[in-house]
Amino acid sequence: MENGMTLAYYGLGAGILAILFALYLFSSVLKEDMGNEKMREISQAIFEGAMAYLNRQYKTLIPFALVVFVLLVVGFGYKEGDFGYGLKVGVSFLVGAIASALAGYAGMTSTTKANARTTQAARKSLNAALNVAFRAGGVMGMSVAGLGLLGVSALYIIFKDVHVIDSFAFGASAIAFFARVGGGIYTKAADVGADLVGKVEAGIPEDDPRNPAVIADNVGDNVGDTAGMGADLFESYGATTMAAMLLGLTFAKNHGFSEVLGATFPLLLGAAGIVAAIISTFFVRTSEDGNPQMALNIGLWSTNFITAIFTYIIAQYVFGSEWAPKIFIAVVSGLVVNVAIGSLTEYYTSNLKPPAQKIAEASTTGPATNIISGIAVGMRSTYLPIIVIVAAIMVGYWAAGFYGIALAAMGMLATAAMVVAVDSFGPVADNAGGIAEMAELGPEIRNKTDKLDAVGNTTAAVAKGFAIGSAALTALALFSAYTDLAKTNPNLQKYLVNGKFDLNITDPWVLVGLFLGGTVAFLVAALTMESVGKAAFDMIEEVRRQFREIPGLMEGKARPDYARCVSISTAAAIRQMIAPGLLAVGAPLAIGFILGFKALTGYLAGVTATGVLLAIYMANAGGAWDNAKKYIEAGNLGGKGSDTHKAAVVGDTVGDPFKDTSGPAMNPLMKVAGTFALIIVPLLLF
């Protein structure tokens, strides 16, 4: 028992190591030159806008978190007859929520402090700019993995009870849903407003300082792709670790191991992934004429490879020679999903591949055919990723039952530090290009930042695929843990047959839950899509007003009111994220307590299956529309300004909320359902 608990300290140590490495990376970024006064001014405006949004978002969520904390303390205190137990559950929830918020702050601060420094570094060399942007992204990556592993390990060491700390994952999930949805609404409202009025109506280039929405657009890159994606993967990391620890107890008990060993092995996997990511960070570099994409790919591949080696060594140590190969195979199946989904996402969204090029060709006959082609590409893109995910589920289950499925998810998420680093590289590079344009640094610098931005677009698409795949496996791991934990509820014993739940697909209650789960996924997608439309309308009206009422703005003689546009996006995002958030949390609560365990189980299956398909479809359709436009802008099919290009801009505008708001909202929706069900299943009455 003591030896097993000692292993948890390795997780604690690795979490601390990740945070220390994040601080080292951040300090190295701050040592870089920020450039001239104009660059500093623009960077500061982006930083202030990003912080204003984050502060307002988290202040809005404080009352929600406190209410949930009180309900958890009272609910579990009453059920167990021990309010000390309820307090532990409530504290675990708050730790998860606070850790998620801290990761968001760390990443947002790093990326917004690095943008001008990346632009200035591009004056020296492409490699210098790559290093600054990647180190800034690394701060977010290490913060996500480090705070996640540190939080779970510390709570387990202190409370010594996995069931008590389930709520850590729910705390992370609750914050992640609002961060993902709010961030997606913010970034797309600003993006659509900047593009439609600036590029289409006014005919000015992207990132032109005359565009009133240009600062809000650059803030949005960080809000959506840094804070939003980071919160999403922090949620997956925490939830998967918790589910794997819970299932590890049962696996160890059934196979003659110490229960603590089964629970602490996922912490060791997380530690292995962090060490692998730190080592791989030093492999990311390129030459002046080199390929930045290859440099980042080497970082990802080496992280996967080193994690796999560490996994076998740890599995051999913890489980011995009989089980080590199967445990290793389960974990590696997750690593394979990581690589496979990334490659598939790149294929369906890259402007160098047939799907996006076919959408571009369809644009020659107008916006309608562009939209039809994009929808078809998105739908077609679902089947191969699903086959990959299903294969990992089967391999994981064959290897170690439900514990194997959770370990497959852990294998995928063990590399989260590097994946988040590579994803957060994108907004830094995008902002760096915007600053180069607004500070009028000339085409040579802009060409370098554009090269990094193009890589950032690809890594963002790959990271979206990773987020979807990890969310799917996380949801399944949570589902497995939920059914395992349900066996401990005396009120649900009547559904057990030979130690397993008898839940037939033809049972009306299960079917009701299935349909409700699928419906909620579509409803959240609709609400978030409408939210972008409403927020974008406000932004478009404001940008038009400024062009109309500010004398000399179009001629570049007057300065736009950037702060007004930032304020509009912030207010709209905070206001519009509340309804989808309440639905995501309220649906499983209502179904569980009104319709019962069978319906809640069906709901989890329905929201997961529908959510995964919607997420893949929307993310890939949006990415393909975006890159079809870029393919035309590269000089193909008439190039910029042609009717074909205008049709592609319409498709890209439709695709924006697909890939950056509604699609990504499915990830936390699935996980919120799973983590909340895990919390309430001991309290269900029937």
Swiss-Prot record:
Activity regulation information from UniProt: Requires K(+) for maximal activity.
Record field: catalytic activity: diphosphate + H2O + H(+)(in) = 2 phosphate + 2 H(+)(out)
Biological-process GO terms, alphabetical: sodium ion transport
GO molecular function list: diphosphate hydrolysis-driven proton transmembrane transporter activity; inorganic diphosphate phosphatase activity; magnesium ion binding; potassium ion binding
Subcellular location: Cell membrane
Subcellular location, principal: membrane
Annotated site residues (Important for ion transport) in this chain: R180, D225, D232, D660, K671
Keyword Cell membrane tagged: yes
Binding of Mg(2+) 2, residues: N218, D221, D430
One Pfam assignment: H_PPase
Keywords: Calcium, Cell membrane, Hydrogen ion transport, Ion transport, Magnesium, Membrane, Metal-binding, Potassium, Translocase, Transmembrane, Transmembrane helix, Transport
Residues that coordinate or bind Mg(2+) 1: D191, D195
Residues at the site labelled Important for potassium dependence: A460
PANTHER family: K(+)-INSENSITIVE PYROPHOSPHATE-ENERGIZED PROTON PUMP
Name of the protein this chain belongs to: K(+)-stimulated pyrophosphate-energized proton pump
Record organism: Carboxydothermus hydrogenoformans (strain ATCC BAA-161 / DSM 6008 / Z-2901)
